[in-house]
Structure formats: structure tokens, C-alpha cells
């Protein structure tokens, strides 16, 4: 089976659904952000602070190409879709899943999370604007799932159905 790339904005449920799908399909799950942190030996927050977003995006593109294109669940960082080369790579080498969640629901979920470099609690309007600027890229995915106010079980049932179509 081709690898499954799970995309979506921060807080949409990519990691949670990736782990659940991994168990269900008996496939390894790989988190691009986690792999970047391991390779760079620093937290993403520190990469952003010390090297900037452009350096992080380069690490992200390199990481994407190093991952298996068969029999893996790949959970991606929310901004991986900003580069056309990444979107093209994922579409050509796997099944791309977009997990949508209402940005106001995401903002509420992330309110206490201090590990997200692009999420500023004080500026929800900027957060929503960033979300909307990426939306068309996310929508290039093969499969779209709305996770807003749904349980993991509901999302998984819908996702399995769409993967098997």
C-alpha cells in the first residue's frame, strides 16, 4: 500500500489520527516534526528561534523525501503544504489526507500549548488568516475529513471508508 500522508493545520488531529490509523492498518507511523527534532537535536521552537522558518521548511522538505513511500503513515507539520514541491511529492507518492477543523475550535484546543511557534494566543485573527492562506493547498489532498467536534472513532470510520473507495 502507498504511504498515507496526513495533513492539516496545527491542532486538527494529525498526530492522534495518525497513531490510530497506524494501529488499525498495522503500519508504522512517522511524524515529520519529531524526525526533524531528532535529526537537528533541538526542538522545533528552537529551530524557529535560532535558524528561522525558512531553515525549518528546508529541513521539512528534506525529511519528506527521506521517508518511506510504501506502508507508512506520515503525519506532517501543518506548513509542509506551503511548498509546491512537497504537495506534488506527497500526491505522487502516496494518499494525501486533509484533516480540516474549524480554526476557532483549534484555537481553543491550543490555548494552553506553548510548543507551537506559529500560534500566538493573543492574535486569533492572525491565526485564522494563516489558516485561510493555507486552505487551498490543503484542499489539493485526495481525501478530506472534517474533524470539527468529532470523536477519534467517528473520524477513523470516515477515513477508513474513504481510503477503501
Swiss-Prot record:
Classification via InterPro entries: P-loop_NTPase, Shikimate/glucono_kinase, Shikimate_kinase/TSH1
Reactions catalysed according to its record: shikimate + ATP = 3-phosphoshikimate + ADP + H(+)
Pathway recorded for this protein: Metabolic intermediate biosynthesis; chorismate biosynthesis; chorismate from D-erythrose 4-phosphate and phosphoenolpyruvate: step 5/7
Cofactor binding mode and count: Binds 1 Mg(2+) ion per subunit.
Binding site for ATP: 11-16, 116
Residues binding substrate: 33, 57, 78, 134
Family assignment from sequence similarity: Belongs to the shikimate kinase family.
The protein's name in its UniProt record: Shikimate kinase
Amino acid at each position: 500500500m502507498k504511504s498515507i500522508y496526513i495533513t492539516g493545520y496545527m491542532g486538527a488531529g494529525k498526530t492522534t489520527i495518525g497513531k490510530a490509523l497506524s494501529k488499525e492498518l498495522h503500519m508504522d507511523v512517522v511524524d515529520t516534526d519529531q524526525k526533524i527534532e531528532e535529526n537537528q537535536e533541538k526542538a522545533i521552537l528552537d529551530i524557529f528561534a535560532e535558524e528561522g522558518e525558512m531553515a525549518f521548511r528546508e529541513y521539512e522538505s528534506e525529511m519528506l523525501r527521506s521517508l518511506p513511500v510504501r506502508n507508512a503513515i506520515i503525519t506532517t507539520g501543518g506548513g509542509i503544504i506551503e511548498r509546491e514541491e512537497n504537495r506534488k511529492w506527497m500526491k505522487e507518492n502516496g494518499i494525501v489526507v486533509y484533516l480540516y477543523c474549524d480554526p476557532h475550535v483549534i484555537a481553543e484546543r491550543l490555548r494552553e500549548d506553548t510548543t507551537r511557534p506559529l500560534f500566538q494566543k493573543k492574535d486569533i485573527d492572525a491565526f485564522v488568516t494563516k489558516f485561510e492562506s493555507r486552505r487551498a493547498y490543503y484542499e489539493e489532498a485526495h481525501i478530506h475529513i472534517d474533524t470539527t467536534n468529532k470523536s477519534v472513532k467517528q473520524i477513523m470510520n470516515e477515513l477508513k471508508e474513504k481510503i477503501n473507495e
